[in-house]
């Protein structure tokens, strides 16, 4: 199985175009969060319309998995935490999103949403506990932020990983975790891809 994982596209349409042009070369395409750009002058609602079109086209070329990142929130929950409702609403045939788990080449792949506070953190923890019951072989997580202490969370000045994710890895023991979020980690001594 041939899979491509990307993250942190931040509404860079040339990167979405490249991905669209190459998606058919892969059995699965995984986008690990930050599809949108909160710092853009273009309103999020307009970015969402364009990115949803890319997602529709991508899922026609390859199995597509998408998780949210800290730039993708378009709504607030009851606890005033950022949530990417638009990603969950984009779910369609061939497109798996936040909260889903699917079998892929003998492994269970769990798509973990961005958490922004105690409520969304507890929801993700419950999702992982439920998914753990279905694991029969390997277990892979897709999560925007990397675990605390890992080389891919090094910013050049500090480790900026997710402490909760590290705890969950120790508790639930997935075989692999794909993440993005820290853009410059590969370019610093002590960092990594």
Functional labels for PLM-detected ranges:
Residues 1-4:
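Extreme N-terminal starter segment of soluble prokaryotic enzymes
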Residues 7-10, 33-36, 70-72, 100, ...:
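Active-site metal-binding loops of divalent metal-dependent hydrolases
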Residues 11-104:
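Core catalytic region of metal-dependent phosphoesterases/phosphodiesterases
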Residues 13, 38-39, 149-151, 186:
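Short, solvent-exposed loop/turn segments at secondary-structure junctions
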Residues 23-24, 55-61, 133-135, 169-172, ...:
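Short, conserved loop/helix-junction motifs that constitute active-site signature segments
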Residues 27-28, 65, 138-140, 175-176:
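Short, Asp-centered acidic motifs that coordinate Mg2+ and/or phosphate
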Residues 65, 154-193:
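Conserved beta-sheet core of the metallophosphoesterase superfamily
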Residues 72-164:
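Conserved catalytic scaffold of divalent metal-dependent phosphoesterases
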